[in-house]
């Protein structure tokens, strides 16, 4: 059975999440096209019609990034498939960001990935979306207006896009990793490091995934030329799979994590420990967003069964 609150959540909604340690924000679309925020501050709250931060085309992809929770950016598409930005800065609240004014039109089936660049106090942003020629395009904000960045090449039409960013302690600048799916259904990585720029190689992390499956990624414990990454995607068995990159081991340990509805979107956040939080739809109350957690103390387990407004 559903609940009145769960019925407000769009089935197969885009999902995005940001955090500052265990202070959490989750974004989703309601059945009227509005983007809402649910939050966790020692307990779950909000997600109601009073917590709308933007309006987007129905079925929009969602991406979000934050610097702690002082600056939050949430990305979606307008009815005309133009990239738009809902922005939050502590002290000024939510407002419409400058992105829509740049009029970057993307494919109607594009997904979105976004990151604040790590290791700097400046507000520098990178967004990844799919153009109508099916290439993955980077869009950059360095404080002086939105511009097109590097084009990462052709991908499967409608591919999921995962992205994460950190700064190695021995590197002068941020590192970026972007994951997407190619026409042959491989899940691949493009990489950027400050001393090399974008590497030309595509690194395959999974040989064959369902077409247009959701992809999400996070990282933790950046050190001296070392990083730990977790990449998630929805596999053909209708479960979320996890692919691990661990320092000294590279890509290894690919395993199923938790069941979802067919076509679920996913979002992942993490903090030191590590602690992992994954958000998805698994059929609870039909369309509620559910949570999976991992921590050293308790290992892998389901967290909140249904985020507000579902219960």
From Swiss-Prot:
Annotated binding of beta-L-fucose 4, by residue: 177, 189
Biotechnology and industry use: Lectins have particular value as specific probes for investigating the distribution, structure and biological function of carbohydrate chains on the cell surface of animal, plant, and microorganism because of their specificity for defined carbohydrate structures. FleA is suitable for detecting core fucose on cell surface glycoproteins and/or a useful vehicle for delivery of substances to the inside of cells.
Matches recorded under InterPro entries: Fungal_lectin
UniProt-annotated binding residues for beta-L-fucose 5: 230, 242
Keyword Isomerase: no
A Pfam family assignment: Fungal_lectin
A GO cellular component entry from the record: early endosome
Disulfide bonds: none
Binding site for beta-L-fucose 2: 73, 85, 146
Residues where beta-L-fucose 6 binds: 44, 277, 291
Residue ranges of the region described as 6 X approximate tandem repeats: 1-311
Start and stop residues of the Sequence repeats: 1-53, 54-103, 104-151, 152-209, 210-256, 257-311
SUPFAM superfamilies for this protein: Fucose-specific lectin
Gene Ontology terms, MF aspect: fucose binding
Record: residues binding beta-L-fucose 1: 25, 37, 94
Keyword terms: Lectin, Repeat
Superkingdom: Eukaryota
Binding site for beta-L-fucose 3: 126, 138, 198
Function in brief: Lectin that specifically binds to L-fucose and weakly reacts with mannose and N-acetyl-neuraminic acid. Has strongest preference for the alpha-1,6-fucosylated chain (core fucose) on glycoproteins among alpha-1,2-, alpha-1,3-, alpha-1,4-, and alpha-1,6-fucosylated chains. Binds to fucose residues of IgE in mice and human, causing antigen-independent IgE-mediated mast cell activation and anaphylactoid reactions in mice and is possibly implicated in allergic response to Aspergillus oryzae in humans.
Subunit structure: Homodimer.
Free-text domain note: AOL adopts the six-bladed beta-propeller fold and contains 6 binding sites per monomer, each located between two adjacent blades. The 6 binding sites that are non-equivalent, and owing to minor differences in amino-acid composition they exhibit a marked difference in specific ligand recognition.
Protein family (similarity comment): Belongs to the fungal fucose-specific lectin family.
Protein name: Fucose-specific lectin
Upper classification of the organism: Eukaryota, Fungi, Dikarya, Ascomycota, Pezizomycotina
The encoding gene: fleA
């Amino acid at each position: 059975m559903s609940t009145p609150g769960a019925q407000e959540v769009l089935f197969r909604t885009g999902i995005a999440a940001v955090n500052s340690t265990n202070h959490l924000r989750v974004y989703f679309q309601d059945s009227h096209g509005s983007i809402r925020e649910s939050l966790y501050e020692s307990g779950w709250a909000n997600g109601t019609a009073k917590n709308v931060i933007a309006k987007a085309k129905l079925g929009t992809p969602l991406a979000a990034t934050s610097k702690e929770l002082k600056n939050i950016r949430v990305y979606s598409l307008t009815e005309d498939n133009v990239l738009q930005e809902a922005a939050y800065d502590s002290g000024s609240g939510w407002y419409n960001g400058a992105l829509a004014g740049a009029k970057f039109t993307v494919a109607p089936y594009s997904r979105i990935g976004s990151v604040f660049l790590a290791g700097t106090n400046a507000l520098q942003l990178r967004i990844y979306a799919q153009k109508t020629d099916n290439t993955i395009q980077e869009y950059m904000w360095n404080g002086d207006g939105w511009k097109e960045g590097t084009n990462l090449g052709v991908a499967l039409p409608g591919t999921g896009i995962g992205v994460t960013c950190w700064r190695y302690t021995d590197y002068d600048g941020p590192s970026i990793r972007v994951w997407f799916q190619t026409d042959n259904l491989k899940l691949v990585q493009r990489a950027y490091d400050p001393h090399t720029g974008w590497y030309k190689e595509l690194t395959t992390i999974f040989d064959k995934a369902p077409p247009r499956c959701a992809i999400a990624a996070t990282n933790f414990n950046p050190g001296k030329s070392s990083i730990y990454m977790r990449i998630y995607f929805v596999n053909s068995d209708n479960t979320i799979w996890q692919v691990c990159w661990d320092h000294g081991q590279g890509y290894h340990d690919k395993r199923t994590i938790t069941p979802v509805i067919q076509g679920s979107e996913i979002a992942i956040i993490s903090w030191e420990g590590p602690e992992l939080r994954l958000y998805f739809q698994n059929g609870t109350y039909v369309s509620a967003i559910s949570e999976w957690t991992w921590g050293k103390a308790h290992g892998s387990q389901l967290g909140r069964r249904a985020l507000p407004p579902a219960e």
